[in-house]
Amino acid sequence: MNINEIRAQFPVLDQQVYGKPLVYLDNAATTQKPLCVINRERDYYLHENCNIHRGVHYLSQKATEAYEHARQTVADFIHARGSREIVFTRGTTESLNLLATSFERLFINEGDKVLVTAMEHHSNLVPWQQMIQRHHGQLLVVPMDDKGVLNLDRYEELLKEGPKVVSIAHISNVLGTINHVKQMVTMAHQYGIPVVIDGAQSIAHHQIDVQDIDCDFFVFSGHKMYAPMGIGCLYGKAEWLEKLPPYQFGGEMVDTVSFERTSFNVLPFKFEAGTPNVGAALGLETAVSFLQNLDREAVEEHEARLLQSAIQQLSSIDGIRFIGEAEQRSGLVSFIIDGVHPYDLGTIIDKMGVAVRTGHHCAEPVMTRFGIPGTVRASFAMYNTMEEVENFVNAVKKAAIMLR
């Protein structure tokens, strides 16, 4: 794995910020895009732009074929049984809202329950919360310990309470904890409960096999895996997608329409109302191909070394406290320093060329659990280097001295 060759594919990294080389460590928020992705979307608008599924002319057919080929590529990437199990969405958030809305229309009744975990991003909390509150139901929450590890004994106890659906993060966007999703899916299925996996933080860093996990649904965003913004995916087992009613209504998702009734299209089209983001879907396919052409195991090992190096070096800072210390972690490190506000630290190291995320990371209940207002989060990608980790740690050390 040649880091320099990889970095050369990401022109945004080759710049200075405030006179310092850019160190981009905000990859959990969004990854940068390789030239092949940028060029593919550009080429679509230059040479192929057309609405799909609706025309007999050359451009429409060409764009339709490209779009559906992208769907099949994504299906193969996550080992779905076929392209009909892949619904293109705007991202993880829309995918989860789609599921919450469709589940509600299908079988949520007064007093029902939904099960999530204590480490969820707001996108995997608020849609379920709002849905269940409309029916005077209960949101059950799997607790975690001080290291950011879920209590699976309590999880099983909560499963016995009969939630209608379980929705859990594969990897926490704050803690970096890798949850035992395969085990959790098996446990839920023993009680006949469907499981949704939020894969926003895992899709870029780990090889995903939805059939091996056996989840009923898996959702992710393209922009967190080197693809354009505005495109994401909802994978669902076909038998579940067949049952669920449409989320939105309009063009393309219908079969027949009259003033008296409407029938809906087949999978996956009944969930894709209106004109889709074709260019971004083609960019997503290109990002998938980009990842598949790499040694994924070598990438995982490289990112793990970056994380361990960062943790080891940061540990020497007086007063540092890591938020999330699970043995199985991936991709990121969150921390606070005694007497230093995360926003102040983030602002100062930005002036040193280092981009990190500060705040509650759209996970306020996690901050409440640890009794803090927010954290500094550094998140890594394949194009980051050990030198960048060292620059980041040195910047944090300097900022901490300035702020105390």
Please provide the spans of the model-predicted regions.
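Pyridoxal 5′-phosphate
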Residues: 1-404
